[in-house]
Amino acid sequence: EVEIIENPSFLNSKEDLKVYFQDKKHYHQTDFYKQQRISRNILLENGKPVGGKWTFDTENRKKYPKNKKSPSISFPQNNRFYEEAKVYVSENFGNHYGELTDYQIYPTTISEAEIWLENFLENRFLEFGIYEDSIVEQEHFLHHSVLSPLMNIGFLTPNYIIEKSIEFAQKNEIPLNSLEGFIRQILGWREFIRGIYLYKGSFERTRNFWNHQRKIPKSFYDGTTGIAPIDKTIKKILKTGYAHHIERL
């Protein structure tokens, strides 16, 4: 007998998601996000959204000032896991796309992940909101948390991150547009897209809406398309494996 255990890396179980996704023809992320806020009593006052509206997205689209210095990030020290992985990747995938750096970028343990979260809250959370849509050519992370890989591999749970961020915001006067914008990425978008994956994933993966026939050219893998914004983003990904949501768009 096979027992399927729910994934703790998401807030909603498959059964939870049925409430919104099953038997619907159209899905709207904002509606889903509201339902999640209400059902979990997150950022609510007397059943209504804190600040008078559900999203502060229109306030979070500022251009990054030309002379503004981006916040510092404390990267983990190289540990034995990283050193072992470096050797393995070099020996087995040396010809693959991507750059194998001498220094460790991302956490590889739970304790490192917790430090990474604290570093975000203390150094980047304050202005996350207004600059979350900003793109700067030579900057990889800006004010973003880069917590998605840590949730995806199970180092940190979304519930833990949400609780910590709300607690920190209340104690440190974090602007509501930063707090709400950050919560929305996890509670809104991440959970919503998982629902789409579970209920429409097979359908979407087996269709070719635009009737594409040609293979993706090599230039889209090495960043030589001649289209500057695309090439710069691809090269960032080759270096760090990461691009924030606006760069991906």
Predicted regions and their residues:
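Catalytic cores of enzymes that engage adenine nucleotides and/or redox cofactors via long glycine-rich
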Residues: 60-245, 249
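Beta-rich, aromatic/charged-enriched effector core domains that present basic-aromatic interfaces
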Residues: 1-105
